[in-house]
């Protein structure tokens, strides 16, 4: 038991130790480069531990069965720390201080707790630890007048999500007598008004955190008012953790037809609303916000599948989406800095061809253009949904995806138009070498996903 508590949660212990050391460095006013180096090293150490656990097939149920370490937990946490490392390298060029690294590390800790959860108590704690630092990150070192407004809107709507989840959990406890996730899924399968109400409230809270339509209201303002690395964090790691938390709750449970219908409807609305609204955006962050809403729809779309293959499809989709989003933000930083006006991309290929090509690959991957990993991610999701007999829904999702290609291709065409006048940009005062590092790391990760599309199937099945 003690060994499992130490080894099974060693990545979390590393992150907790990192947070404490970073706090000490902040108090002692130590050079911020020490904190950034420690952050990257700690995440690499955590990733190494997770790889070892996967190689040995390590599993454990600890803390009175509130925490479960299994392959899903290990893969999910590896995705989170890997994305955190890429984001960390990208953020080095933004001259982030110890406070920034403390907040990011705290959110990563919350994300990992979510993926470890076998009970709703630890799951709820993880969600709150994930979300709370985000409010501060949005206003940290941010001179925008809209930063506070976006942060407050995110805080208020996140509080609503928290209240919904808590009320749902009270109904779960009244129905099952405990807060174990497996007991909840078993109770939901039996039906009943109380179990239905609990499911609606818990799922609504998660949908709000994941910015699924119509619970998306906070995302455009929050994303557009934050600095670009923070926007990348909110759009990638936070969303990935929440979606994987939903998978943790549902597991391989067979959903009843009514639940499948509701999830399918919300996923369709998210896809169409996000893709159609993104077409009219002239700012990169706003476009990314509506893109993330549509991608949340694709992720929810995978939950329609009742064959059990949705877990592997969602792991691949979440990993590809998160890495692509961070890489796209890093490339945009190289091209335009903190000014997110898409007009800055006009004809930029002539000045910065490599960054323009990398951003184009990321954008086309988000659009689902073959043979990029974004296409493979959508292919796996569509395959699982069609296999479960939902052909009509899959056709509608394909139409939504087709609509989404318009605004993605618009970004690419801006960069490669020979007749466009390049907008003069102010000189960037910070060194972009680390931003390049984050962009290249993300590109390498995407290349790995493209070359090894079955990587999560192999790991989940222990091949």
Swiss-Prot record:
<feature type="transmembrane region" description="Helical">
    <location>
        <begin position="432"/>
        <end position="452"/>
    </location>
</feature>
<keyword id="KW-0997">Cell inner membrane</keyword>
<protein>
    <recommendedName>
        <fullName>NADH-quinone oxidoreductase subunit N</fullName>
        <ecNumber>7.1.1.-</ecNumber>
    </recommendedName>
</protein>
<dbReference type="GO" id="GO:0008137">
    <property type="term" value="F:NADH dehydrogenase (ubiquinone) activity"/>
</dbReference>
<dbReference type="GO" id="GO:0050136">
    <property type="term" value="F:NADH:ubiquinone reductase (non-electrogenic) activity"/>
</dbReference>
<feature type="transmembrane region" description="Helical">
    <location>
        <begin position="34"/>
        <end position="54"/>
    </location>
</feature>
<dbReference type="GO" id="GO:0048038">
    <property type="term" value="F:quinone binding"/>
</dbReference>
<comment type="similarity">
    <text>Belongs to the complex I subunit 2 family.</text>
</comment>
<feature type="transmembrane region" description="Helical">
    <location>
        <begin position="393"/>
        <end position="413"/>
    </location>
</feature>
<keyword id="KW-0812">Transmembrane</keyword>
<dbReference type="InterPro" id="IPR001750">
    <property type="entry name" value="ND/Mrp_TM"/>
</dbReference>
<keyword id="KW-0874">Quinone</keyword>
<feature type="transmembrane region" description="Helical">
    <location>
        <begin position="230"/>
        <end position="250"/>
    </location>
</feature>
<feature type="transmembrane region" description="Helical">
    <location>
        <begin position="120"/>
        <end position="140"/>
    </location>
</feature>
<dbReference type="GO" id="GO:0042773">
    <property type="term" value="P:ATP synthesis coupled electron transport"/>
</dbReference>
<comment type="subunit">
    <text>NDH-1 is composed of 14 different subunits. Subunits NuoA, H, J, K, L, M, N constitute the membrane sector of the complex.</text>
</comment>
<feature type="transmembrane region" description="Helical">
    <location>
        <begin position="259"/>
        <end position="279"/>
    </location>
</feature>
<keyword id="KW-0830">Ubiquinone</keyword>
<dbReference type="InterPro" id="IPR010096">
    <property type="entry name" value="NADH-Q_OxRdtase_suN/2"/>
</dbReference>
<feature type="transmembrane region" description="Helical">
    <location>
        <begin position="314"/>
        <end position="334"/>
    </location>
</feature>
<keyword id="KW-0520">NAD</keyword>
<feature type="transmembrane region" description="Helical">
    <location>
        <begin position="286"/>
        <end position="303"/>
    </location>
</feature>
<dbReference type="GO" id="GO:0005886">
    <property type="term" value="C:plasma membrane"/>
</dbReference>
<keyword id="KW-1278">Translocase</keyword>
<feature type="transmembrane region" description="Helical">
    <location>
        <begin position="72"/>
        <end position="92"/>
    </location>
</feature>
<feature type="transmembrane region" description="Helical">
    <location>
        <begin position="356"/>
        <end position="376"/>
    </location>
</feature>
<feature type="transmembrane region" description="Helical">
    <location>
        <begin position="196"/>
        <end position="216"/>
    </location>
</feature>
<comment type="function">
    <text>NDH-1 shuttles electrons from NADH, via FMN and iron-sulfur (Fe-S) centers, to quinones in the respiratory chain. The immediate electron acceptor for the enzyme in this species is believed to be ubiquinone. Couples the redox reaction to proton translocation (for every two electrons transferred, four hydrogen ions are translocated across the cytoplasmic membrane), and thus conserves the redox energy in a proton gradient.</text>
</comment>
<feature type="transmembrane region" description="Helical">
    <location>
        <begin position="154"/>
        <end position="174"/>
    </location>
</feature>
<keyword id="KW-1133">Transmembrane helix</keyword>
<feature type="transmembrane region" description="Helical">
    <location>
        <begin position="99"/>
        <end position="119"/>
    </location>
</feature>
<feature type="transmembrane region" description="Helical">
    <location>
        <begin position="5"/>
        <end position="25"/>
    </location>
</feature>
<keyword id="KW-1003">Cell membrane</keyword>
<keyword id="KW-0472">Membrane</keyword>
<dbReference type="Pfam" id="PF00361">
    <property type="entry name" value="Proton_antipo_M"/>
</dbReference>
<keyword id="KW-0813">Transport</keyword>
């Amino acid at each position: 038991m003690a060994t499992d508590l130490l080894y099974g949660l060693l990545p979390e212990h590393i992150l907790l130790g990192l947070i404490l050391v970073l706090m000490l460095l902040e108090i002692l006013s130590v050079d911020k480069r020490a904190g950034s180096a420690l952050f990257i090293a700690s995440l690499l150490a955590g990733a190494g531990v997770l790889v070892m656990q996967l190689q040995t097939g390590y599993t454990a149920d600890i803390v009175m069965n509130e925490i479960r370490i299994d392959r899903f937990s290990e893969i999910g946490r590896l995705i989170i720390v890997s994305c955190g490392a890429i984001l960390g390298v990208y953020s080095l060029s933004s001259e982030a201080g110890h406070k920034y690294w403390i907040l990011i590390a705290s959110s990563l800790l919350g994300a990992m707790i979510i993926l470890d959860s076998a009970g709703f108590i630890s799951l709820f704690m993880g969600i709150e630890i994930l979300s709370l630092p985000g409010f501060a990150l949005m206003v940290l070192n941010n001179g925008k007048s809209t930063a506070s407004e976006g942060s407050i809107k995110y805080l208020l709507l996140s509080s609503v999500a928290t209240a919904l989840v808590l009320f749902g959990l009270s109904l779960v406890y009244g129905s099952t007598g405990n807060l174990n996730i497996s007991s909840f899924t078993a109770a939901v399968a039996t039906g009943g008004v109380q179990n239905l109400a609990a499911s609606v409230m818990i799922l609504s809270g998660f949908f709000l955190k994941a910015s699924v339509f119509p619970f998306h209201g906070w995302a455009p303002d929050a994303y557009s008012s934050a600095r670009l690395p923070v926007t990348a964090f909110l759009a990638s790691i936070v969303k990935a953790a929440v979606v994987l938390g939903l998978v943790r709750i549902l597991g391989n449970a067979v959903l009843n037809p009514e639940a499948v219908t509701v999830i399918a409807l919300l996923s369709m609305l998210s896809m169409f609303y996000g893709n159609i609204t993104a077409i009219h955006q002239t700012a990169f962050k706003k476009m990314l916000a509506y893109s993330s809403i549509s991608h949340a729809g694709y992720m929810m779309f995978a939950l329609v599948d009742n064959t059990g293959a949705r877990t592997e499809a969602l792991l691949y989709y979440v990993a590809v989406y998160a890495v692509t989003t961070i890489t796209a933000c890093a490339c945009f930083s190289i091209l335009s800095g903190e000014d997110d006006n898409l007009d800055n991309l006009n004809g930029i290929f002539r000045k910065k061809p490599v960054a323009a090509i990398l951003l184009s690959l990321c954008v086309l991957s988000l659009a689902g253009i073959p043979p990029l990993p974004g296409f493979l991610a959508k292919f796996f999701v569509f395959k699982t949904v069609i296999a479960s007999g939902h052909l009509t829904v899959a056709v509608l999702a394909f139409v939504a995806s087709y609509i989404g290609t318009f605004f993605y291709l618009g970004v690419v065409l801006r960069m490669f138009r020979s007749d466009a006048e390049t907008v003069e940009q102010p000189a960037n005062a910070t060194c972009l070498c680390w931003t390049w590092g984050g962009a290249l790391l993300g590109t390498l990760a995407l290349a790995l996903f493209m070359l090894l599309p079955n990587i999560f199937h192999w790991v989940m099945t222990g091949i």
